[in-house]
Amino acid sequence: MKVVYDDVRVLKDIIQALARLVDEAVLKFKQDSVELVALDRAHISLISVNLPREMFKEYDVNDEFKFGFNTQYLMKILKVAKRKEAIEIASESPDSVIINIIGSTNREFNVRNLEVSEQEIPEINLQFDISATISSDGFKSAISEVSTVTDNVVVEGHEDRILIKAEGESEVEVEFSKDTGGLQDLEFSKESKNSYSAEYLDDVLSLTKLSDYVKISFGNQKPLQLFFNMEGGGKVTYLLAPKV
């Protein structure tokens, strides 16, 4: 098994978010894609990653290969990577994985392939009341600003706008609408409002680097879904349960 991806920063951004949620995870290298699904320690959030083989510079996978790893350890490896460097992940043995950071100098890491117990996660089919495509940078700024004053982020949807805000002693409100330019598209069935953990949203803000826009979907008493559609066909989905 051997795959090469041109920009190591993409994997770094994904693992950075993942490391905030779980201690261990499994990357599945299949014939047509690399996949990862992980449920956080408290079973409040879930992250799903699909990177099709077309995104990779090289992709040589004949049989499914599972790479179990410690997220913090892998993050330490990826931190040595610089801008525009590539990453090669290869294995000739089920017990270990070779990670090469390829740039002006090549760095090779021999990583033990861990036996990670995989949780049975049922297929989730949710019907949302609102789906909106908004600027990733705008979403990141909104969550960063709101999370500085509250533990709960309120997400509110109307027919023509999305609001991300803090309520209570300190009030902050960020509006996304077509008038302000932060809202690209909006699918609306009814007005909705929910509270979500500011900490859990702040933990995954590195995902906003994956695409210019993020599709957020939610509804009354329903999870918040963040969907990042990457250049080249990659997809990253993050689900977060509402506060009760």
UniProtKB/Swiss-Prot annotation:
GO process annotations (BP): leading strand elongation; regulation of DNA replication
Example of a GO MF term: DNA binding
Record-linked PROSITE patterns: PCNA_1
UniProt keywords, alphabetically: DNA replication, DNA-binding
Keyword Transcription set for record: no
Pfam families assigned: PCNA_C (PF02747), PCNA_N (PF00705)
InterPro entries: DNA_clamp_sf, Pr_cel_nuc_antig, Pr_cel_nuc_antig_C, Pr_cel_nuc_antig_CS, Pr_cel_nuc_antig_N
Domain of life: Archaea
Keyword set includes Chaperone: no
Subunit structure: Does not individually interact with either of the other PCNA subunits, but is recruited to a PCNA1-PCNA2 heterodimer; does not form homotrimers. Heterotrimer which circularizes head-to-tail (head is at N-terminus, tail is at C-terminus) to form a toroid; DNA passes through its center. Replication factor C (RFC) is required to load the toroid on the DNA. This subunit interacts with DNA ligase, RfcL, XPF, and weakly with DNA polymerase I.
Family in the record: Belongs to the PCNA family.
UniProt function note: One of the sliding clamp subunits that acts as a moving platform for DNA processing. Responsible for tethering the catalytic subunit of DNA polymerase to DNA during high-speed replication. DNA polymerase I, DNA ligase and the flap endonuclease may be constitutively associated with the PCNA heterotrimer forming a scanning complex able to couple DNA synthesis and Okazaki fragment maturation. Heterotrimer stimulates the Holliday junction resolvase Hjc.
Protein name: DNA polymerase sliding clamp 3
